[in-house]
Amino acid sequence: FRIYKNFNLSKKDKEAIILIGNFDGLHRGHQKLFNKAKNFKKKFKLRVGVITFDPIPKMFFKKLHNYRLSNFDQKIQLFKKNYVDFIVNQKFDIKFSKISCFDFIKKILFNKIKPKYIFVSDNFRFGYKRAGDIKLLKSLEKNYGYKIINPSPLKSKKFVISSTLIRKNLEMGNLKKVKKFL
């Protein structure tokens, strides 16, 4: 298991399955994504990597404290349990926040990581002012040689299971619901 602080990956970690997100709390919705990645790992004999950000962009922009559901060490343990081979723990700062969505795809994903598969959730946004989304990533698959994998979101009744939903239920003291989502 390897932890990178930047996007300069070793050769063996390039051309992998990449999951991108904050993965705070690694709830059941995340677990669905990781299970699908595990199946791809077995089927295609590829390594699995995670790109995550520190701090969580929302924490950075809104100056939030006590916002996380899991700390970095807890995340590492959860990733290891979910067949992840390496992570890129990218520092999220002003400089990184100004990278355009197109530069993120070309200069980071294509030039440095060269993923075969990119796993993201429906609400994934990236790049300066969150301009990039799953539609943009899909539209550039052929240009950059990756395939987007986007499993349908996991729902509990009518709600999509998300870290935001878990935080709201924690704030309201709905611990039974929180336990059901994790």
PLM feature spans:
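Nucleotidyltransferase catalytic core that binds NTPs
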Residues: 1-182
